[in-house]
Amino acid sequence: MKKFLPLLVLLMLMPLFAAAEDAVQYDAILSRDTYLVEEPGGRSIIQLPDREQVEVLSLGEEWSRIVYDREVGYCKTGYLYHFVSRDPFSYPVPDRQRVTGFASFNVATDIKGGKFNGLTAQPGQVFCVMPGEEEYYRVPIWRDAAQVHQAEVTYYPFADWQSADSGDVIGGFTTFYGEQQGKGKAAEREHNIVLGCERIHETVIRPDGYFSFNKLCAPYSQNNGYRYAPNISQTGFGYGGGVCQLTTTLYNAVLTLPLQVDEWAMHRYTGIQYAPQFFDAAVGSYSDFIFKNTLPYAIRILATPQNGILTVLILRE
């Protein structure tokens, strides 16, 4: 009997190994009609409808192994978007912006990128950056990036969340806004951004606690202090227009850390101009942005509007 014990143990553990291998890494949405296939380039199993949600078991450069309607197979990775990680510690969201720290301007600096008309940043204004070439930092701006010379700023790398001390900045993100988004109501749009920042600024989320944007900022109405400004809707205007830029900035800041996104909606497939496609976050009567603090300590949110530079930083409390 003893000689069969290792075999019995192995047989008992096999389902656990299979379960681990088949663990869902992400939820995602299909961007088009396609087919679930047995293996990359292989025979079709079932049709996959456009805009349906699937579970991603493994994410590959060209093909991903997924589950749809209890069927397991493969589809092209390029047909998937709206990724929500089931385990942000092990599976960060693909194609997120890899910002590594924040900086403050030492001198007045002209900055522009993509279709953004640009602005003159003032000394002391804070923004998040990515590594650049040689003596430059890269600043994500409107689906593009600007180059800022290191001599013009003071740089502070994000602290590693695992070894951070109280007060350390561990994540963040920046987006840019201006007159060209206003449709004649740029001041009203900026008012809404500033009001939203005031309502989430200094919010502390305890370990295993949840942050709900709507809990702090909704309803988006005149009675709640918001002004009529451009938004993404059938009419193109609404009370609270511009607040979603704050939500988007916060969402991308959250993605710099292993925090669990619980509820998140995009405006539309094409996205919005001030953030990369598939990385905007809409809020309203029927949508919220909610995440869970999965870190072993409390975190604090700092939301700072700076005359066209909107920066959200996340600190260890």
Q: PLM features: residue spans?
A:
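Sec-dependent N-terminal signal peptides of Gram-positive bacterial secreted proteins and lipoproteins
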Residues: 3-20
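SH3-family beta-barrel domains
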Residues: 19-35, 47-50, 57-60, 81-115, ...
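Short alpha-helix capping/helix-loop boundary micro-motifs
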Residues: 38-43, 112-115, 197-198
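A mature extracytoplasmic/lumenal domain signature
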Residues: 40, 60, 68-70, 79-81, ...
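SH3/SH3-like beta-barrel superfamily modules
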Residues: 46-78, 117-157
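Solvent-exposed, conformationally flexible loop/turn segments
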Residues: 51, 124, 205-211
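Polybasic, low-complexity association/targeting segments
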Residues: 160-206
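Exported/periplasmic cell-wall-interacting domains
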Residues: 210, 217-317
